[in-house]
Amino acid sequence: MTSATSIRAVAVAPLDIPLHVPFGISGGAQAMANNVLVTLELADGTRGYGEAAPLPPYNGETQAMALAALRTAQAWLPGRDAAEWRALAAEFSARGGAGCGSAQCALEMALLDAVTKRRGEPLWKFFGGASTTLETDMTVTTGTVAEAADAARAIRARGIRQIKVKVGGAGGPAGDLARVAAIYAAAPDAPLILDGNAGISRAAASELVRGLRAAGITPALLEQWLAKDDLAGAAALIAESGWRVAADETACTADDARRIAAAGAAQVVNIKLMKSGVIAAWELATAARAAGLGLMIGGNVESMLAMSVSACFATGIGGFEFADLDTPWFMATNPFDGGFAVTGGMISVAGITAGHGVVPKE
């Protein structure tokens, strides 16, 4: 007899969402979220949804790569039991999904959504139910000094307390300093996270630290300024600045967390489900915590679907000091209903009663 959790169908489709403004990081910018939606339908009609959000300037992954990886699952996943989600995720990885972390993430999201939705369990409880609220920042992407100041004022007008600033742009340290100073003047009480996306050299990092110190600006966090493999440089940046440093591109697996801690290369790791999938992110969070590293939850340019999974993940596990779950607000349209609620910068998942709570609009 067919199990109620047997997978009946797998649908994979592009998910293209225009942005209000280009989302720029040190490696480039994009004006459209070119993502992928995967839908799993179980034998009893339950549907689970997952999102791949590849970000070419971040790690080189593209929508075409995610589509190709997920479409391979259409050949072997039907007839398999979604209740065996961990084994199915491992099989997808072994069949090539591991080559595209955002695709791995999308499949795992869809599996977990279907399984927890069917049994009436919210995903935040599945992850541990530690809490239901989380405070997010909002990002000022790369751009001009005037645009940075305007964005900072708009962020504070939304009631958001923390501001993340993309640095490492074409203007070099002087350009970064001018933008950060303008943001600081516009929102002097806002904790600032300065994110280099691995695009700043050691020399430029030292110059920017000196400039910030001279301007009287003390960031709350320096996020991945240096190349992802430069652990010694990151440790030196901590010593030189005296400020806290977060690893992002460097931290993709549990082994990465242990290497970072051993090298003294960061005090915080930014966990993104899109890097290697939900399961790998869970293992990374466990290893980071065991190594004494603080936790941050972030993402790529993701819709409410993927961001709600990240919110469930972070609130359910608990102990996340920083959160950067703002990209749904950069999108000109929202193709989904449901997900987390937000007031100012405070996210609540309490209203999610089964799965991640997000469904495509009719």
Give the location of each predicted region.
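Catalytic domains of carbohydrate-active enzymes, especially glycoside hydrolases
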Residues: 155-166
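Catalytic core of soluble alpha/beta enzymes
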Residues: 167-308, 332-342
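Metal- or metallocofactor-binding catalytic centers and their adjacent structured scaffolds
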Residues: 41-118
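Flexible C-terminal active-site loop/helix
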Residues: 2, 8-19, 35, 301-362
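Active-site beta->alpha loop and helix N-cap motifs at the rims of alpha/beta catalytic domains
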Residues: 121, 138-150, 154, 173-176
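Conserved, mostly hydrophobic/aromatic
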Residues: 7, 38, 45, 107, ...
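Structured beta-strand/loop patches that form or line metal/cofactor-binding pockets in enzymes
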Residues: 2-44, 48, 52-58, 333-336
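N-terminal small/glycine-rich loop or linker at the start of catalytic domains
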Residues: 117-142
